[in-house]
């Protein structure tokens, strides 16, 4: 696998801030004024190891102002609990929301960090009662915690999954209520919503989200766009990714620039850019 110089992207990809939010986003900063689109999501929307993620491709092709609020390892809490970000969402003509996993948000069983949603902060009394034998101080990330809970007691783990899924649907509905313009839900993954959503090993995002959960949002008026990346599609873009040797493992979990180009082409008609963008051959 080719490893390019990470210097081309710069440290943290030109971080910028919006309003009073303490979260850093990928630059360059776009002023949230007039007509604009906003993109919310995790690693793929942020565009880790990619020079031009799909929000930038759409902006260039459609000639629109596009605010990329994608954030590495983001969960829904990053947005629904930040007034500055919700204000941007409410003012957007179109809001594209990448479907994010259900593990990275606070719920009845545990609390996550308000900005780094993949960080496990503490277990609730309810979870401690469900798993009295677990030392929760040993875990710092939500995925590792869930893997341990599943291994300890698959039966109790199903109760946790049920709670996370219910909380995810409620949180998504809350976020969609803040959208004044058109809302587009983007399923961007290497698996279909019908596939195993409980695979906890690296990859498999959005974790724990399935078709039933998407169907529960059908009455919100949001449009659903599904893009399931094939292995060939992912592999064909690897050479164009930019990362250091230390980042190789993380880069292998990303879908890559070919997928971003294809996704941009799928979304282009929503922005009047259907004739300007063509999917790669």
List each language-model region with its residue ranges.
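Polybasic, low-complexity association/targeting segments
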Residues: 1-4
């Amino acid at each position: 696998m080719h490893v390019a110089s990470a210097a081309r992207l710069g440290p943290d990809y030109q971080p910028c801030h919006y309003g009073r939010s303490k979260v850093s986003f990928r630059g360059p900063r776009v002023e949230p004024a007039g007509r604009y689109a906003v993109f919310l999501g995790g690693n793929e929307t942020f565009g880790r190891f990619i020079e031009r993620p799909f929000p930038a491709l759409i902006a260039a092709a459609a000639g629109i102002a596009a605010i990329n609020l994608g954030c590495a390892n983001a969960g829904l809490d990053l947005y629904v609990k930040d007034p500055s970000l919700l204000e941007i969402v409410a003012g957007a003509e179109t809001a594209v929301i990448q479907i994010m996993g259900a593990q990275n948000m606070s719920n009845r069983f545990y609390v996550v960090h308000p900005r780094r949603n993949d960080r496990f902060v503490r277990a609730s009394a309810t979870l401690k009662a469900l798993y009295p034998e677990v030392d929760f101080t040993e875990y710092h990330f939500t995925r590792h915690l869930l893997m341990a809970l599943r291994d300890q007691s698959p039966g109790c783990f199903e109760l946790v999954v049920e709670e996370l899924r219910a909380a995810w649907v409620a949180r998504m509905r809350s976020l969609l209520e803040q959208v004044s313009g058109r809302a587009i839900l983007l399923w961007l993954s290497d698996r279909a919503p019908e596939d195993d959503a409980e695979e906890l090993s690296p990859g498999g995002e959005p974790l724990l989200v399935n078709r039933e959960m998407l169907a529960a949002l059908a009455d919100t008026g949001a449009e659903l766009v599904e893009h399931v990346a094939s292995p060939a599609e992912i592999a064909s873009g690897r050479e164009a990714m930019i990362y250091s040797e230390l980042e190789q493992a993380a880069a292998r979990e990303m879908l890559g620039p070919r997928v971003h180009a294809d996704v941009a082409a799928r979304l282009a008609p929503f922005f009047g850019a259907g004739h300007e963008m063509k999917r790669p051959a």
